[in-house]
Amino acid sequence: MTDLKETLCGIARAIVDDPESVSVEESVDGKRVNLTLHVAEDDMGMVIGKQGRIAKAIRTVMRAAASADNRDVNVEIR
């Protein structure tokens, strides 16, 4: 079983300038996993990317990881 919270945390820490500020909240509702990624305000642009491309890529990778366990994932960035 893939630890989605740790996967998202690792991806985000690799992108941002302040990896210490990265945290992830997880809530599970059946097969649906809701993840909220918190990053420093200065790093928000790096995580979202131009026109949201980085955020979309992160969500795509997380969906692929979740589908391996027949789960659905929702990633919110704050």
Task: Report each predicted region and the residues it spans.
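An amphipathic, aromatic/His-enriched active-site/gating alpha helix that lines ligand/cofactor pockets
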Residues: 54
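RNA-contacting regions in translation and RNA-metabolism proteins
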Residues: 1-46, 57-78
